[in-house]
Amino acid sequence: YGDTVHSFVKRSGRDFMPGFRNEAGGVESGEIHLMMIDHIVANVECMDEWVGFYESVFGFDETAHFDIQTGRSALMSKVVGDVEGYIRLPINEPSSDNSQIQEFLNEFKGAGVQHIALLTSNIVDTVVAMREQGAEFLSVPDTYYDALPSRVGEIKENLEDVKRAAVLVDRDRDDGYLLQLFTKPIFDRPTLFYEIIQRHGNSVGFGEGNFQALFEAIEREQEKRGSI
């Protein structure tokens, strides 16, 4: 889709990609506990076309389907991936002219990667450290946390720490939950952004319980840009 390139990599006697060089340095204050890519999300004009592409070319399966609506925008999303669950690729399609997906397609001049989700072992410390380094995240209203204990149940993290870091929480299984937060777009146009995500137990979802709060946060940014 768009200018996206898929690379096949076989590692043999290498720590990473050919030509990779480990540069010294990094974050001097705080700790950023990023581990690996959790999933990559695509925004496209025709979702089913690319779901079929991944099924026929890569042998992936469709593993989830979402139809999300707010008062002002909407999207449809299907998730494809391998049988083992190592690869997860949600694919979004706009279902309204003023949706965040349509805005992305307009600004990006076509289909492309909407966001990259990075897995962390400690999202509170990671988000705090990234903010100290200048990262900007979407804002979460304090009211989001009023019903959090009753909605997600007991979690290992301290709720006050989660609230101070403005992290979202969702329980997608009885024995699994996730914490997540999204950056603002990293370029001057509303295109690519990052997600920081932490999973506990057998969590395999994408924060479906947070979609309403996430959409409202994105729509606030769209209002600032005059997109809606």
Model-derived regions, located:
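Glyoxalase I/VOC metalloenzyme domain signal
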Residues: Y1-E62, R72-I228
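Active-site and NAD+-binding cores of ADP-ribose-processing enzymes
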Residues: H65-D67
